[in-house]
Amino acid sequence: MMKYLLVEDERFAYEEMKRMMEKLRPDYQLEAWTATVEQTVQFLKHHPVDLMLLDIRLTDGNSFDIFEQIQVTTPVIFTTAYDEHAIQAFKVNSVDYLLKPVEEDDLLAALRKFE
């Protein structure tokens, strides 16, 4: 069973991503939901996952800060409302870069790339 971490600071966006993942990949297990850089770093230090769905702008910083604090080898599907981070995203384990609001078809295509 694939385990994933959902990193999102907006509850509505979290609920929507979770709903789409449950529909598209019911066999994937949500290990945790984190909303900050600090929560994510602490979680990843102790809990390996197979995939991360990672919002770029978080309440306590930029999600790229995570990669500066710990070594992350987990594949990442980035989500953001902004497109200026695309180049940076592909330098750190990026499977795909999805603009919000994330469309189900786009998430499905990203999951297929991951698999």
Regions found by a protein language model. Give the residues of each.
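Conserved acidic carboxylate
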Residues: 8
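Short, flexible, glycine/charge-rich loop motifs used to bind or transfer phosphoryl groups or to couple energy/partner
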Residues: 21, 42-43, 65-67
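Extreme N-terminal starter segment of soluble prokaryotic enzymes
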Residues: 1-4
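Charged phosphotransfer/docking patches of two-component systems
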Residues: 11-15, 86
